[in-house]
């Protein structure tokens, strides 16, 4: 979607290299990323975008799931993490309305699997589900991608 927009792209990276496996995963994603994408690290929110001009650009957030996880681990409370997450996206959406940039959010659907056996796992699953619903309600288009095949929900 971002490539098809034909605009200069800002890639909002939300992953944190907490261990060697994650470092390798991030490195692989960096190598796969098109060279004309400008990467901005946004693991806890979008304040790093404040200094950037975003009009006539595409902004890709990859991914919402890591951002939610990072905020949950910082806040240690699902309700506080929810409020903080929707506040971050609310600011981003307000800016998008003013500047008109093309925004793509990538998230995971984790509510379709087995219920996690840990409290934190269940809290994350529920929190991400609420955030995904909040984002979908405010999005013009919503896709569900399975096996690389996009299904447009809205």
Task: Identify the residue ranges that each predicted region occupies.
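Conserved P-loop
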Residues: 1-54
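Short coil/turn segments at beta-strand junctions that form active-site/ligand-binding loops
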Residues: 7-8, 55-57, 99-102
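Conserved RecA-like P-loop NTPase ATPase core
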Residues: 29, 60, 108
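Short, flexible active-site-adjacent loop segments at beta-strand->alpha-helix junctions, enriched
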Residues: 15, 43, 64-65, 109-110, ...
């Amino acid at each position: 979607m971002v490539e098809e927009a034909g605009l200069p792209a800002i890639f909002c990276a939300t992953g944190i290299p907490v261990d060697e496996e994650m470092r390798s995963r991030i490195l692989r994603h960096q190598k796969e990323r098109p060279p004309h994408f400008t990467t901005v690290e946004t693991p806890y929110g979008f304040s790093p975008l404040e200094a950037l001009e975003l009009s006539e650009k595409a902004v890709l957030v990859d991914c919402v799931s890591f951002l939610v996880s990072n905020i949950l681990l910082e806040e240690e409370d699902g309700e506080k993490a929810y409020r903080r997450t929707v506040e971050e996206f609310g600011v981003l959406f307000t800016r998008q309305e003013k500047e008109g940039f093309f925004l793509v959010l990538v998230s995971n659907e984790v509510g379709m699997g087995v219920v996690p056996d840990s409290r934190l796992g269940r809290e994350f699953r529920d929190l991400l589900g609420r955030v995904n619903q909040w984002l979908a309600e405010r999005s013009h288009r919503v896709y569900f991608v399975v096996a690389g095949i996009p299904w447009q929900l809205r």
